Swiss-Prot record:
Segments of this protein annotated with the region Disordered: 261-291
Feature: compositional bias, Acidic residues: 264-291
GO biological process: double-strand break repair via homologous recombination
CDD domains documented for this protein: GIY-YIG_SLX1
Renumbered zinc finger spans (SLX1-type): 189-242
Task of the protein: Catalytic subunit of a heterodimeric structure-specific endonuclease that resolves DNA secondary structures generated during DNA repair and recombination. Has endonuclease activity towards branched DNA substrates, introducing single-strand cuts in duplex DNA close to junctions with ss-DNA.
Keywords: DNA damage, DNA recombination, DNA repair, Endonuclease, Hydrolase, Metal-binding, Nuclease, Nucleus, Zinc, Zinc-finger
Family of the protein in this entry: Belongs to the SLX1 family.
Entry GO MF terms: 5'-flap endonuclease activity; crossover junction DNA endonuclease activity; zinc ion binding
Protein name as it appears in the record: Structure-specific endonuclease subunit SLX1 homolog
Gene Ontology annotations for the cellular component aspect, listed alphabetically: Slx1-Slx4 complex
Organism in which the protein naturally occurs: Drosophila persimilis
InterPro entries linked: GIY-YIG_endonuc, GIY-YIG_endonuc_sf, Slx1, SLX1_C, SLX1_endonuclease, Znf_RING/FYVE/PHD
Taxonomic placement: Eukaryota, Metazoa, Ecdysozoa, Arthropoda, Hexapoda
Gene: slx1
Length: 291
């Protein structure tokens, strides 16, 4: 299989959760420019499913109303539940308790396109909890649709352009992220000085490969939240040992990759359009959690 283009990012299978926006390119005026919001763990595969129809895993709402373009995707969610909650709120802004404070989201403005309306909803969502605390990436997949947000988004979020490729290959992961030397862990937490039990589950370290920071996950979270009383999920901060700037989402992603990928998910590069795994049809009802 040829390597991905230089502007194409590589995400590791089992660690990618995205919420995407489709726009119809149908020649039928009833469907052209209509939009659809969905969840995926594999963007390339998902758009193929939508364009091939229900029999190949596409959604009922998109069947025979395309062809569709996946114009943007939001990713960086810590898990599929968080992404599904985001998807549901983006689909249902009038029902989401977090978005009811924005009465202007109840309907499209006069002459506003379906894309502009969905983009306006997204802009509002990125500024409210719990999503404004997440280190999300807003990725443009089609340059024709790129535009700036009217309202500023949190500075720890990233806006990028280019496709994303999902790979189960350990070789590709190492090529994309670099092969780091084995971590020399301490047996005690550097912050509370207590022994770290069940280290595979509760231990975190620094992203600086030369730093030997070893902490309980909760201890490091509390340390990084020192200047933010009342919050539960840190955004980032300085390493208590080497003062490297840390991103909480990057720490968790690094830990997941250190735990490895299940054997059944490795080295399987063939696409199966009839089975999209954890991807969920947007007709599924998702309960919105309260703070």
């Amino acid at each position: 299989m040829p390597p991905p283009p230089e502007d194409e990012a590589i995400a590791h299978k089992g660690h990618f959760y995205g919420v995407y926006l489709l726009c119809s390119q149908s020649l039928d005026s009833r469907y052209r420019a209509k939009c659809y919001v969905g969840f995926t763990v594999n963007p390339k595969r998902r758009i193929k499913q939508h364009n091939r129809g229900c029999d190949f895993g596409g959604a009922k709402k998109t069947s025979k109303k395309g062809p569709w373009q996946m114009v943007m995707i939001v990713h960086g969610f810590p898990n599929n539940i968080s992404a599904l909650q985001f998807e549901w709120a983006w689909q249902q802004p009038t029902l989401s308790t977090r978005l009811k404070i924005f009465p202007d989201l109840k309907r499209k403005k006069p002459k506003e396109t379906h894309f502009d309306y969905n983009f306006r909803i997204l802009n509002r969502m990125l500024g409210v909890g719990p999503w404004h605390r997440l280190a999300l990436t807003i990725r443009w997949l089609e340059t024709d649709y790129e535009r700036a947000f009217d309202l500023p988004i949190p500075c720890h979020m990233e806006i990028v352009s280019g496709k994303v490729s999902i790979s189960a290959s350990q070789r590709k992961l190492e090529e994309a992220t670099g092969t780091a030397p084995p971590v020399a862990w301490a047996h005690e937490c550097h912050l509370c000085m207590q022994s770290i039990e069940q280290p595979e589950r509760s231990r975190l370290g620094c992203t600086n490969p030369t730093c030997r920071l070893t902490c309980h996950m909760l201890c490091l979270a509390s340390y990084l939240l020192g200047d933010e009383p009342g919050q539960y999920i840190p955004i980032g901060g300085e390493c208590p040992l080497c003062e490297t700037r840390l991103s909480w989402s990057a720490l968790l992603q690094r830990k997941r990759l250190q735990l490895g990928v299940p054997e059944e998910m490795q080295d399987n590069e063939e696409e199966d359009l009839s089975d999209d795994g954890p991807d969920v049809d947007s007709d599924v009802e998702v309960q919105e959690f309260s703070d």
